[in-house]
Structures are given as structure tokens and as C-alpha cells.
A protein has these predicted regions:
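Conserved catalytic-core helix/loop/strand module for nucleotide-ribose chemistry
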Residues: 1-154
Length: 154
């Protein structure tokens, strides 16, 4: 890494944010399934995902779950905010804030060791860590934005 700065990319999943008390994708799905179950009068289930699969004849997906619970993009943002944005109490506890790992990655980027970071995360902890380092990252969060992105020069 030291002899070939910038030649590496990172791929991050939800594990990087778990210690910040951000739920994993699986856990978010479980909570969304629970919301659907409660609305249908089901109070408890040993396996939330299996209940959904049995009831809907398909595996749970974010799109399907959100389509069941909310109808507008604004409602979607409000629903998902609970999972990723800290409440006042969570702020006091230091939860849902960039971790040492997020900050270390931001420093690696600032120093030029890493130029490309791919993440499957919905949270913005990595972007916040970049802001702490004075970096404005180019974030591509949906497919159409790829064609509008600034090309990476090697």
C-alpha cells in the first residue's frame, strides 16, 4: 500500500457501522418485517424473514418491504431515518457517529492511499468522517449518477 499509493479500492459493508449502533441490513429488514406483521395483527415470530416468505411467497427485499409500509419518497426517508440518524439520547451516548474505522479510512483517503471506496451502506458515517478530515467525497448513490460522475484519473 505504501509503495503504490492510490492503487487500492475498499469495499465496505454494514459491519463497519455495527459498533456505531447502526443496524445491519438484515436487522433493518427484520424491523421492517415486524412493522408489517404488527399491522397485520401478528405479535411474535421466531423467524421474521421466514414469516414474510411464507406470507408473501417471496424473500424480503428493501423495495418490497418499503412498498408495503410507505407510499411516498418522503415517507421512505422518514421511516429509514430512525435506523441511521441519531436521536438526542443516541448523540449523548456517542451512537450513530463515525467510528475509529470510518475515521481511519478517511485519513487513508486524505493521504492518497485509497481513492475508491465502494459501500453497500445506507448510513452516512463514512461521508461524515470525510467531512471531519476536510474532504468532500464524490458520492454516487444511484445508478443514473454514474454517468455524471467525475472520472477517476490513474
Amino acid at each position: 500500500m505504501y509503495s503504490n499509493k492510490g492503487a487500492y479500492a475498499l469495499l465496505l459493508g454494514s459491519g463497519i457501522s455495527r459498533s456505531a449502533h447502526i443496524p445491519s441490513g438484515w436487522e433493518v429488514e427484520e424491523k421492517l418485517i415486524q412493522k408489517i406483521e404488527v399491522s397485520q395483527g401478528v405479535a411474535e415470530s421466531e423467524d421474521w424473514h421466514q414469516w414474510y416468505k411464507d406470507c408473501y411467497k417471496q424473500s424480503a427485499s428493501y423495495s418490497a418491504l418499503l412498498g408495503e409500509i410507505v407510499k411516498t419518497p418522503t415517507e421512505r426517508v422518514q421511516l429509514m431515518r430512525f435506523f441511521f440518524e441519531p436521536t438526542n439520547k443516541e448523540k449523548e451516548l456517542g451512537w450513530k457517529a463515525p467510528t475509529k474505522a470510518h475515521l481511519a479510512i478517511a485519513r487513508l483517503a486524505k493521504e492518497g492511499y485509497v481513492r475508491v471506496i465502494l459501500t453497500t451502506n445506507f448510513d452516512r458515517l463514512l461521508e461524515k468522517a470525510f467531512e471531519f478530515e476536510g474532504i468532500t467525497p464524490q458520492v454516487i448513490s444511484y445508478e443514473r449518477a454514474i454517468s455524471q460522475a467525475t472520472p477517476i484519473i490513474h
